UniProtKB/Swiss-Prot annotation:
Transmembrane segments: none
Record-annotated TR mART core domain positions: 163-390
One Pfam family of this chain: ADPrib_exo_Tox
Active site: 285, 309, 354
GO cellular component annotations of the record: extracellular region
Protein's name according to its UniProt entry: Uncharacterized protein R217
Organism: Acanthamoeba polyphaga mimivirus
């Protein structure tokens, strides 16, 4: 098609071009204008010629007009830059509303007039169609969409995206030595899809490791490790070198922590028996310092004294450590049992896609890069890594050992005596009686806990080791704790057989018990059954001793599947927990904590109400999830029966149906039982009613002095767990 125009400098001189790009550029620059209707007739062009030109330039997709609010200018933007301009620089598409507003400006500036001139040449409806096509294409070209499927996606885990981005394919192809080119075309990158898919960890491996963790009754241990257990375990291992006896300094006086060592041994056994990987894979780790690696030469072996948390997704860490750290790349072997454990199915941070390698693992250094060598790598992939170490897995000390042989042994160490405490005896301790309520916690910790911040109590038929630990719940850890506090103190105890936390008490004016379990699971062995009189008594006495007024006991959370379920159903059902307290009440009327001094913080009648509430008053065909279809096929007519059905058959949708309960309870959190399944134990009333005490202080006496917790926390006091990566992420 020929594009006829007249130069602005010679409006009666008709010229033409065959190139639409030249034509659009000149129109945009204001150096030419459309021919008028008389000139069209003179050239004997069709009546719709000018409109055809408008449509053609509006459908022209190589360059399109975008509006920049910062400068109030319309710019002609190349298609490859459309997505970055809109996403990163806040440029915007132009539509009829924008054009109308522009025309209606009462006192337009010269810029406004020029914008109006540019847009007068376009058919805005056609232009919008072009925008949509370009935006999608630009999105793809700018490395945000491909059709290359992740082999891990078919595990059904919700945090895994189905497709690689082009940036990921580009990075992995280069990093895995599939190409030596730093810059690849879209078609070249896509050609690496099958090769990259073969190297990545498949769904089969993730599912094997998931069911292995479940069958080992280790969900609670993995949850604990991923939250704060890894900090305490690795701090102990690195400090004492207890898994590498040959590196222990003879001059060191090591005070043993047998409780923590037991958790470490259980975790090592769990990894040692983990299924092997179907293929060789690459995992990554970012660290802040390489002091422990600097001495290595190519070919040297490094043996780690602690667990190593790695990721199969370099982009997770790459994006979050973009300010510059040290990258470690490790190649792990295929078909060797006990190499490492994929924990993402049960991790509290599944997006980390974490693979844990055990202590004593040996790594051979095969490559090292820093400074200038990394410059191209950094510029292309946006990694501001100071150094890059590449290792290959060699082995670990546990692979050929039997489980009973995995024991930590530290020669010439000190094993502190257990501090047995009968809390009931302390009720008559004059030192406690004469202390203010706010000073009791410090006195108890200083007087009755060991050097490891532990004390031991006999409750019922079991002996429990309790730990004082500290936390900061103001950042990434906020969801896992009831109290939002910089210097929080908690008391925990774990199952000696499985290593999981079976009670977690957040200390304060109220002791909050097991709030964390909504993100974990209640101890499956029922070693701790709080719904027993001996625990109600112990919690009440403990509140008295440390100066807390009440105890709030939160719901148990469990998971289940039927023996008749298929493997796929078991894999799905063992990922989702639910409130055991709600389920058992709705299922068969079971109530927890029916003690005089314990009051539920919800109304059971509100749960009964569900059995009279029609499902289709809540679940609608316009809902975006699967609930409507499943509700139709379930045959359930009321919300109570439907909730039970979802738990037993489709636990993936538990959170969805619980969100729907807002409709049932008119969006009133105060009456919605799903918002607060907990029970309030009036601890001091319990002691008063059972004649342990003869006086209950006034409420104003149950206060915590500002800074009193902080004084108890420190490296030589109650140790606070840290995770620098997650802390950094929350600060950004």
């Amino acid at each position: 098609m020929s594009y006829y125009y007249v130069p602005i400098s010679s409006p009666y001189q008709i010229e033409s071009t065959e190139y639409i790009d030249d034509f659009v550029t000149m129109l945009f620059d204001g150096s030419i204008e459309f021919i008028n209707d008389e000139q069209r007739k003179q050239l004997k062009l069709p009546e719709n010629y000018i409109q055809s030109v408008r449509e053609n330039i509006s459908l022209y997709s190589d360059r399109v007009p975008l509006y920049d609010i910062g400068s109030n200018h319309i710019f002609l933007i190349h298609r490859d830059n459309v997505y970055p301009r809109i996403y990163f620089e806040n440029y915007r598409f132009i539509d009829q509303n924008f054009y109308n507003d522009l025309k209606n400006i009462k006192k337009p500036t010269s810029i406004d007039k020029n914008n109006l001139r540019i847009l007068s040449h376009y058919d805005l409806s056609k232009l919008y169609t072009t925008y949509m096509k370009i935006f999608y294409d630009s999105f793809v070209v700018n490395s945000y969409i491909t059709h290359c499927q992740r082999p891990s996606f078919f595990s059904g885990m919700e945090h895994i995206r189905p497709y690689y981005t082009i940036n990921e394919l580009n990075y992995l192809a280069y990093d895995w030595n599939l190409t030596n080119k730093l810059s690849l075309t879209t078609s070249e990158i896509n050609s690496f899809c099958k090769k990259i898919s073969q190297y990545d960890i498949p769904a089969e491996t993730l599912l094997d490791h998931q069911m292995y963790i479940y069958d080992s009754k280790a969900i609670g241990l993995v949850k604990h490790y991923s939250l704060f257990g890894s900090y305490y375990m690795n701090y102990y291992l690195r400090k004492n070198k207890c898994c590498l006896p040959g590196e222990i300094n003879d001059d060191m006086t090591i005070v043993r922590n047998l409780y923590l060592e037991n958790q470490i041994e259980i975790m090592i056994r769990l990894i040692k028996n983990a299924p092997g990987f179907t293929k060789s894979h690459t995992v990554y780790r970012f660290v802040e310092t390489d002091d422990y690696l600097k001495h290595l030469n190519i070919g040297d072996i490094y043996q780690d004294s602690s667990f190593m948390s790695t990721t199969r997704n370099p982009f997770y860490y790459k994006e979050n450590y973009a300010f510059g750290y040290i990258l470690i790349k490790i190649t792990i072997p295929k078909k060797i049992k006990g190499t490492g454990l994929c924990i993402e199915a049960y991790s509290n941070f599944p997006n980390e896609e974490e693979i844990v390698l055990p202590p004593t693992t040996r790594y051979r250094l095969v490559n090292y890069m820093e400074n200038q060598e990394l410059e191209n790598f950094q510029n292309v992939f946006g990694i501001v890594a100071k150094k890059k170490y590449e290792f290959e897995w060699v082995g670990n000390d546990y692979i050929d050992k039997a489980d009973f042989e995995i024991k930590i042994d530290i020669p010439n160490s000190i094993i502190p005596k257990k501090n047995f405490v009968d809390l009931k005896e302390l009720i008559n301790d004059d030192n406690i009686k004469n202390l203010s309520i706010s000073d009791r916690l410090k006195y108890f910790r200083d007087t009755y806990s060991s050097v490891n911040n532990q004390f031991v109590c006999q409750i019922g038929n079991y002996e429990y080791i309790f730990n004082f630990e500290a936390y900061n719940s103001t950042s990434v850890y906020k969801p896992f704790f009831y109290y939002e506090i910089n210097d929080g103190i908690m008391v925990t105890t774990s199952n000696p057989k499985y290593g999981n936390i079976n009670i977690l008490m957040e200390l304060g004016p109220e002791i909050h018990v097991n709030y964390y379990f909504r993100y974990s699971v209640t101890d499956p062995s029922i070693v701790v059954d709080l719904n027993r009189s001996e625990w109600i008594e112990w919690l009440s006495v403990f509140s008295y001793v440390i100066g807390s007024r009440n105890v709030v006991i939160h719901s148990n959370y469990v998971l289940q599947y039927d023996k008749s379920d298929t493997i796929k159903q078991k894999q799905m059902k063992t990922r989702y927990t639910f409130s055991q307290n709600i389920y058992l009440y709705l299922k068969n009327g079971t109530k927890f904590f029916e003690f005089d001094e314990v009051v539920p913080n919800f109304d059971y009648a509100r749960l009964d109400y569900l059995f009279g509430y029609n499902v289709f008053d809540v679940i609608k065909p316009t809902d975006r999830d699967e609930l409507y279809r499943i509700t139709q096929s379930s045959g359930k007519s009321n919300m109570g029966d439907l909730y039970i059905y979802i738990i037993e058959n489709h636990p993936k949708l538990i959170r969805s149906i619980e969100d729907k309960m807002d409709i049932v309870y008119n969006y009133n959190d105060n009456i919605n039982p799903f918002k607060n399944i907990s029970y309030n134990l009036d601890a001091w009333r319990y002691l008063y009613d059972h004649y342990y005490i003869n006086h209950i202080p006034s409420e104003k006496e149950f206060t915590i002095k500002k800074g009193s917790f902080k004084k108890l926390i420190g490296s030589k006091k109650i140790v606070k767990f840290q995770n620098r990566l997650r802390t950094y992420l929350m600060s950004q």
